[in-house]
């Protein structure tokens, strides 16, 4: 059989880096791992084709016996469009992934088959059923699959040069019980991991295909610390033997800061960046959302302990908790600045389907709407200690201040000058990237306007004078700022529209509205 597996285009967000990808010569920051994984689960007797809409146009006329579409909640509308387009051409269409697992009813009638849960057992079973004409409308995972039996994803089917990094997975599941999180709903609280030799084979394959960065997409890489340490030792040994050809990134919980051995292993394995869901500097908000692991010790001290091992902390931050009031926005900004966190993915609290938060606010009558999956534009919860208008106005101010030239430059310099050394002297830069980075800087200085020129020259100049060994990281941060600054300007426009709607809802007839939020600078 011929099988086409389609990944929808990502809408713009902090995660997509749309503002700089064209100048970097890339089409997407990294691939969704679902479809290469599914291709790896498909027998060699079948022909599998991958189509990632982030790097190529979708050809609805490709001859295929089965077309599979995956996606998150944020991809829901596009998933339905893709399914309809292929169905109109007589294709047999199936849907899976987080959106299908959390909101299967939204896709009924749009797909011939819906997959709920992980696919290691259900996908091969479906293929057998399809060949005999005995397929079911729904395939649901009953037991969590053993990842040690999972075959290698088909990385070879990806158009690797179009991605900034490749992705692999070590484990699924998380031991914590954060109220807003859908990870434990989908994958459970007991982390399940691949064998170390499986992961190392995937690392070698990514390196063979030309990757210079690998993002390990686990939602909590250290959910099982014993296994995580085993893998980190293997990665460190491999890196040492091969002159550290890959930068590694992943996601962890903040309790990593309490384990010196773990931090030393991350350093030895050449992890340059880790994403941590810090969520809030306010302890009451952390306790409310059951983020108890973030309440141990001082937050800023914990972040700096990670940074002291040469690792950049990217933060996930949220506003809109029940214990948040109108003061939280300045509190968030102050924390991010003092913690020296250059990159913060700051969003609005959302109640995702099937999560404990969703069930609670639904029971309390505070669920405003179903989640659209975009936490950077919408909160579907009625806040407790402020109005929705106050929440949106405050959030709009916060994201503008975060990526203001002065604020970003200050905390980035603070981080670069204080960060611990790295095992391999910083991030890997491909030979072709050196010239490209130079051209980007030249273009930035010529066409970015006087404020961007000042920002770039001062960031690089101070770094070169005070710590020249991290100059290439400073160049990277200067370029990345273009993406975030561009996105926050676009986000401000969408938030203004939402604010205007809320103002109209609460305004007496005939009363004009006023804009109370400071703007995002050009």
Label every PLM stretch briefly:
Residues 1-209:
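Acidic, low-complexity intrinsically disordered segments
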Residues 2-5, 12, 47-50, 110, ...:
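Radical SAM enzyme core and accessory elements
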Residues 5, 69, 116, 216-218, ...:
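Conserved beta-strand positions
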Residues 106-124, 265-273, 331-346:
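Structural recognition of alpha->loop->beta junctions
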């Amino acid at each position: 059989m011929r099988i086409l597996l389609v990944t929808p285009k990502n809408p713009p967000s902090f995660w997509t880096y749309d503002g700089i990808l064209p100048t970097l010569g890339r089409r997407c920051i990294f691939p969704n791992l679902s479809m290469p994984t599914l291709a790896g689960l498909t027998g060699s007797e079948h022909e599998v084709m991958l189509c990632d809409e982030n790097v190529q146009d979708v050809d609805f006329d490709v001859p295929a016996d089965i077309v599979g579409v995956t996606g998150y909640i944020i991809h829901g509308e596009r998933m339905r469009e893709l399914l309809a387009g292929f169905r109109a051409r007589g294709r047999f269409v199936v849907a899976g992934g987080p959106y299908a697992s959390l909101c299967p009813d939204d896709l009924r009638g749009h797909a011939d088959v819906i997959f709920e849960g992980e696919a290691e057992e259900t996908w091969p079973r479906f293929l057998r059923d399809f060949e005999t004409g005995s397929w079911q409308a729904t395939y649901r995972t009953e037991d969590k699959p053993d990842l040690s039996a999972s075959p290698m994803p088909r990385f070879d089917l990806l158009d690797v040069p179009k991605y900034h990094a490749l992705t692999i997975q070590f484990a699924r599941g998380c031991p914590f019980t954060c109220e807003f999180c859908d990870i434990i709903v989908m994958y459970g609280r007991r982390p399940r991991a691949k064998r170390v030799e499986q992961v190392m084979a995937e690392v070698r394959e990514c390196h063979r295909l030309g990757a210079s960065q690998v993002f390990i997409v686990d939602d909590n890489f250290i959910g099982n610390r014993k296994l995580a340490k085993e893998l980190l030792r293997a990665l460190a040994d491999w890196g040492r033997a091969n002159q550290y050809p890959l930068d590694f990134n992943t996601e962890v919980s903040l309790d990593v800061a309490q384990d010196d051995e773990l931090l030393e292993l991350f350093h030895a394995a050449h992890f340059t960046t880790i994403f941590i869901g810090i969520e809030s500097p306010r302890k009451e908000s952390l306790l409310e959302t059951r983020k108890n692991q973030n309440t141990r010790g001082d937050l800023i001290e914990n972040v700096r302990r990670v940074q002291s091992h040469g690792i950049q902390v990217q933060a996930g931050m949220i506003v809109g908790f029940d214990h948040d009031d109108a003061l939280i926005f300045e509190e968030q900004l102050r924390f991010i600045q003092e913690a020296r966190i250059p990159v913060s993915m700051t969003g609005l609290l959302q109640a995702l389907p099937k999560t404990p938060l969703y069930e609670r606010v639904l029971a309390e009558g505070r669920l405003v709407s179903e989640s659209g999956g975009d936490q950077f534009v919408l909160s579907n919860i009625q806040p407790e200690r402020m109005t929705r208008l106050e929440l949106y106005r405050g959030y709009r101010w916060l994201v503008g201040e975060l990526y203001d030239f002065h604020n970003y430059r200050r905390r980035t310099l603070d981080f670069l000058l204080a960060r611990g050394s790295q095992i391999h002297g910083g991030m890997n830069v491909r030979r072709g990237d050196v010239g490209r980075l130079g051209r980007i800087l030249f273009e930035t200085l010529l066409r970015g306007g006087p404020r961007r020129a000042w920002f770039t020259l001062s960031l690089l100049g101070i770094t070169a004078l005070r710590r020249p060994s991290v100059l290439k990281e400073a160049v990277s941060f200067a370029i990345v700022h273009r993406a975030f600054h561009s996105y926050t300007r676009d986000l401000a426009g969408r938030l203004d529209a939402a604010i205007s709607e809320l103002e109209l809802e609460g305004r007496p007839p005939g009363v004009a509205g006023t804009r109370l939020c400071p703007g995002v600078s050009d």
